[in-house]
């Protein structure tokens, strides 16, 4: 795996994690694990026998302005991997410097990835840029979600100031299938209907039956949720005041 070079002479934590999964002896195995800085992983475990479950560990003190984190993962052919995190990613207040999180996930032929991290919480005054890219083969399978919490609504705290730029991309066989951007600045939450919870769930390769079933389940969220199916990509988007409803 080619590692991404970290920028030098910057304030904040610079961290990188390179992962590769290969099928060995009848199961998916983490064969490459290279890290720089505070990004690391727990020991893989196998509650589903052949499927490799892995927990990513972000810096324990949270993410602040000037931090730059890069995660690269390759899931080789015929592998099945579930990647999650033990807790939410917290982006704290910054005096102006941006915190950056770049995530690059590549799925080879017939590979399956369940990308199920906990939510990302953005404290008032945080300045964060997130960029997540999935590179798929047409024969691979992806289940992923992207959960954002603006402020801390459980204690009545809103994202009254700060900035968030979130970019989500899915490419299939080198062609773009989804490129989505969210930009929030200066406490202006009109673009998300002033809801603190913003969620996106993705499934490839989806079908019409799944789309109809999901739309029925989204009915209680009324106008704050929707599902689409485009070229096999099933996308669910939702806004909420309650994280339990999102989950």
Curated annotation (Swiss-Prot):
Q: Which UniProt keywords apply?
A: Chaperone, Cytoplasm, Nickel insertion
Q: Which range is the signal sequence, renumbered to this chain?
A: none
Q: Which Pfam families match?
A: UreD
Its main localization is cytoplasm
The molecular function GO annotations come to:
nickel cation binding
Statement: the UniProt record of this protein carries the keyword Cytoplasm: yes
Self-association and partners: UreD, UreF and UreG form a complex that acts as a GTP-hydrolysis-dependent molecular chaperone, activating the urease apoprotein by helping to assemble the nickel containing metallocenter of UreC. The UreE protein probably delivers the nickel.
By sequence similarity, the record places it as follows:
Belongs to the UreD family.
The protein's name: Putative urease accessory protein UreD homolog
Q: Which organism is it from?
A: Escherichia coli O157:H7
Lineage, please? Bacteria, Pseudomonadati, Pseudomonadota, Gammaproteobacteria, Enterobacterales
Q: What gene name does this entry carry?
A: ureD1
